[in-house]
Amino acid sequence: MTMDSSTLASGARETTRLHATRFAFAPGLLAACVALALAGCALGPTGEPPAMPQPEHYGAQAQPAQTVAAQGVAQQFVTGAEPVPQWWTLYGSDALDALVSEGLANSPNLAAADHNLQAAREQLRGQIGSSLLPTVDAIGIAQRQQQPAIPQFGIDQLQYGIFAGLIDVRYTFDVFGATRLNNAALASRVNVQAFQFEAAQRALAANIVASALGAATLHAQIDTTGQLIALANAQADDVQKRYALGSASRTDLLSAQQSAASLAASLPGLRQEWVAQRHALAVLIGRTPDQAPPDLDLASVTLPAQVPVVIPSELLRTRPDIEAAEATLKAAAAGVGAATAQMYPSITLSAALGQGGFSWPVVTSGAGALWAIGASLSQPIFHGGALVAQRRAALQSYEAANDTYKQTVLTAFQDVADRLAALDHDAQALDAASTSARTAQGVYEDTNARYKLGAVPWYAVRQSEQQWRNARLDEIRYRGTRLSDTAALFQAMGNPPVNPATLGSGRGADTAAAAAAPASDAGAAAQGK
């Protein structure tokens, strides 16, 4: 049996499922498609965040211009100032700066978040490249087939080969904006991860500062508690001697012993808190707990004298959690538009060019030339209500994102209000504790001077020193709290707002970066990417 070249080419085209089709667009249809494409932006919500209340001040009461002066520092609340990027440097401690730098460079959690962000950006780049540009594929076919004989019709058994090599090009027009909206939704979700990564960086820095200050505060408390225990034990020994001489009652002895034991019982708990803080700090900066850094000298840490208070309307642009919620809202809005666009027709053009035949001589000759060009139009008609349900689901997701944004803003306002109130109250508590410590120290010094003159017994000096050390313990605790709460306020202020015109890939500018010059898959594979 013989076949001419036209039959050979036809068989190859059928094998590769390419059909020659002519498709002509009427001018009226083109105009309608353009009009619908221009209307694609109205397929869903705009994604603009809802209007939020703009309070005159954050808390139930307006914050003062500054706190009371405690230990010589009255912190000023600078209303309208921008957040400080590297706020931890304001503590004036090189050791603290080094800890934060080490943590930002070595934290496994932060590194994992960064890798996840980069993976999301690459996925966006791939989706934009595959959806906005034509796909080009090389197709090669080499087959050997056998057809059975049909003696009744005089057809003998036939064996033949099919060989073909084609370049296939396809492109789907984004007439109704489905592709654009899907890309916008994915870009917004990538921006969510970018803002979450930014929030993770700031949270890590704040946690390192809080852990370092907490460990230093506990260290100072342990030292002071140790001095109190030594004084209490000495007092108990003195009462024991006086009891043996009959100058002290048994009740006095038991009371002194109970006081010493009570102080001793508090020390293991403080040490456990201190060790836990050191272990936590080591892990935060990427070390094992046995490599925990030495404690800071609490006396060398300077309290920042000024703290920024971003106005409520600007807080929406400085807090990464609010920006992430806004990006989530934009993604949900684009999802509604994409779900709507799926209900409209899609148009795809395809073309192929190559060589084919039943033998290599035919494949390499002009008779083996193959080509196909075609277009397809697909209009959903009945999908069991799936497309309508998907759009309703997208609308509900959008409403949920809208409500989540509102809650995120309200929570941010509450966070700032709590931090401002805490700093004000911390200063008041520290001022009172410092006054108490100074007074107790004065009593101790006077009692000691009177003892040297023989006016009071030694145990009176020891008792006055105990009172001073107890007051000093409270002063240390409140100073540590004030330092930590200051860090929390810096953290609550967020980052300085970024000009969108100069926004780089470090924050929410992933769409343009991902869309830039998609590389060919073959080239990337050749480079091992």
Q: Model-predicted segments: where are they?
A:
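Terminal intrinsically disordered/low-complexity segments used for targeting and assembly
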Residues: 2-9, 25-105, 163, 187, ...
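Short flexible linkers and secondary-structure junctions
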Residues: 42-207, 347-351, 370, 381-391
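Membrane-embedded beta-strand positions in outer-membrane beta-barrel channels/transporters
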Residues: 100, 164-168, 212, 312, ...
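Outer-membrane beta-barrel proteins
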Residues: 147-149, 250, 358-362
